[in-house]
Amino acid sequence: NRVRRRGVATIRGMMALAVAALAVTALTVPSTSEAGMQRFQWQNRPLLVFAPDGDDPALQRQLGIADSHAAGWRARDMVTIVVAGDRPVTVDGTRAKDLVNDALRQRYRVTGDSFAAILVGKDGTEKLRHDAPISADKLFRTIDAMPMRRREMREREG
């Protein structure tokens, strides 16, 4: 019986530690709203592109993909959010005063010296992440497989 009680106490202690760790994480990682991303929820599918600076070759390649597939971007309600170096954040090339570089880097856990392309769904959750540019084909296949996108396509057809 004593062994069983010790085991239960250990499990309770581990659970308390896990809850405390989650609470600390919740306090240190900005939420979607704190990072300024709530304005896109249920409206757009953001592709966040993080780069060490604006001249980063991977950033330029990802922007080229977006430009050359603009019709597909629009059809899927996509926007491109660029977080490059310490420059102001842009949405589709326009400065976004409500989006803060550091808050986005912290929210999506991307360091200042790395490249990352992150697709966020209309529900505000991360759908795809790569440390290299993502092809339009991969982005479109990922989005087109989403239940919300399928519903949108059916509604546009009917």
Predicted features along the sequence, with ranges:
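Non-catalytic interaction/Regulatory regions outside core domains
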Residues: V3-G158
